[in-house]
Amino acid sequence: DRRQRQMCIRDRNGFITEDGKSPGFDTVMNIYNTFYYSAAHPVASGNLVAFRQVKRVYPFEAAYRRTIISRLQELFAGKTEELRKACEVLGGTLLPQGDVGYVLPVFPFLNIAVLFWDKDEEFEAQANMLFDSEITEFMHEENVVCVAADAVYYLTLAAGMTPEKIYAQ
């Protein structure tokens, strides 16, 4: 069941829906902020980099690691098949890195990558996300963290787990 998520923005009132329902605060704000904060003519680089290499996100790195990455590691430790299935359901493209590694579409013009190494008898689970190096040309740097939080939400939902809402309730 690979599908690209499709959202609708009502021209009369600006409401955003997915299958007739609001997709949630973080998703809606990411979309609105992309309209508001994007550069005049943003272009994705296609070059996926670690969070700390994204322009102007440094002040948010500690919170990103503490909330997003640690939660992703906890949620999918011992559940690589569930994570793999979720990435495929979300339209991901397989990567050779990690026990599970996929490029996921955020918008039709912008991707992130999710990389995951499962726990074993010696090491805890490890995870990372990579972002287009020009993502802050599309949105405010604080929204990069929200994109990552949304990724965790949609991955847990697609995996058949309780959807993980890291920021917005």
Go through the PLM ranges and name each one.
Residues K55-V100:
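Negatively charged, low-complexity tracts enriched in Asp/Glu with abundant Ser/Thr
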Residues D1-D11:
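Single conserved hydrophobic/aromatic residue that forms the stacking wall/gate
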Residues G20-S45, D132-Y167:
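Ampiphathic alpha-helical segments that act as solvent-exposed interaction surfaces
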Residues D120, N128-E134:
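Low-complexity, glycine/alanine/valine/leucine- and proline-rich hydrophobic stretches
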Residues R12-E74:
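Long amphipathic alpha-helical segments with strong coiled-coil/leucine-zipper propensity
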